[in-house]
């Protein structure tokens, strides 16, 4: 099975700041990767929340330097919302992949089996998250853009400037 590639075009403080390209582990966690891919394309239309199931126009609401950048709450924009293509939440698929370093793409959650649409991109190795968060992809291009977003974070997680996913989608194989 070939792995899907998806992208985010990022703006920081309203300025175009580059593209992040991610490879998804469709072969390891097909349900988790499939959810993220569909949220990048917006192909599933409107969700139960009444909002489009799409990352486009959403922001990185939690950015902690030397840790990670978190986004994917397209329903409320503050970390309390989000929705998967399967309905609200879905189970942890497996923990085969680990949080090995910068660029790891993983699901944010509120405890076991609470995956929705929120995700994070690691900016360092975060091994303490292994077995708690489902890793489902990695950055293959644009780690510098991830770092640019990270530089707009704070210890509280509140971003200094708005860091948005201005556009997103799937790249052809």
Swiss-Prot record:
Q: What is its EC number?
A: 5.2.1.8
The record's disulfide annotation reads none
This protein's record includes keyword Isomerase: yes
Q: Which domain of life is it from?
A: Eukaryota
- Which InterPro entries does the record cross-reference, listed alphabetically? Cyclophilin-like_dom_sf (IPR029000), Cyclophilin-type_PPIase (IPR024936), Cyclophilin-type_PPIase_CS (IPR020892), Cyclophilin-type_PPIase_dom (IPR002130)
The protein's matches in Pfam families, at most eight in alphabetical order, are given as: Pro_isomerase
Q: Where is the PPIase cyclophilin-type domain positioned along the sequence?
A: 7-170
Can the keyword Isomerase be found in this entry's annotation?
Answer: yes
Note the CDD domains from the entry.
Answer: cyclophilin_ABH_like
Q: Which GO terms describe its biological process?
A: protein folding
The cross-references to SUPFAM superfamilies, in alphabetical order and at most eight, read: Cyclophilin-like (SSF50891)
Q: Which UniProt keywords apply?
A: Isomerase, Rotamase
Reactions catalysed according to its record = [protein]-peptidylproline (omega=180) = [protein]-peptidylproline (omega=0)
**Molecular function terms in GO for this entry?**
cyclosporin A binding; peptidyl-prolyl cis-trans isomerase activity
The record's GO CC annotations read: cytoplasm
Tissue localization of expression is: Exclusively expressed in the single anterior excretory cell.
Q: What does this protein's UniProt record list under function?
A: Catalyzes the cis-trans isomerization of proline imidic peptide bonds in oligopeptides. Plays a role in protein folding, transport and assembly.
Q: Which family does it belong to?
A: Belongs to the cyclophilin-type PPIase family.
For this entry, the protein name equals: Peptidyl-prolyl cis-trans isomerase 3
């Amino acid at each position: 099975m070939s792995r899907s590639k998806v992208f985010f075009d990022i703006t920081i403080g309203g300025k175009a700041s580059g593209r992040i390209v991610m490879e998804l582990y469709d072969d390891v966690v097909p349900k988790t990767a499939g959810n993220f891919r569909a949220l990048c394309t917006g192909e599933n239309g409107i969700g139960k929340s009444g909002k489009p199931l799409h990352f486009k126009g959403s922001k990185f609401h939690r950015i902690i330097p030397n840790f990670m950048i978190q986004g994917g709450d397209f329903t409320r924009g503050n970390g309390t919302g989000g929705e998967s293509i399967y309905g609200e939440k879905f189970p942890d698929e497996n923990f085969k992949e680990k949080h090995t370093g910068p660029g790891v793409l993983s699901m944010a959650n509120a405890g076991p089996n609470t995956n929705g649409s929120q995700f994070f991109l690691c900016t360092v190795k975060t091994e303490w998250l292994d077995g708690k968060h489902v890793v489902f992809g990695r950055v293959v291009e644009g780690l510098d853009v991830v770092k640019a977003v990270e530089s707009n974070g704070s210890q509280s997680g509140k971003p200094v400037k708005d860091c948005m996913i201005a556009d997103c989608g799937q790249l052809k194989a």
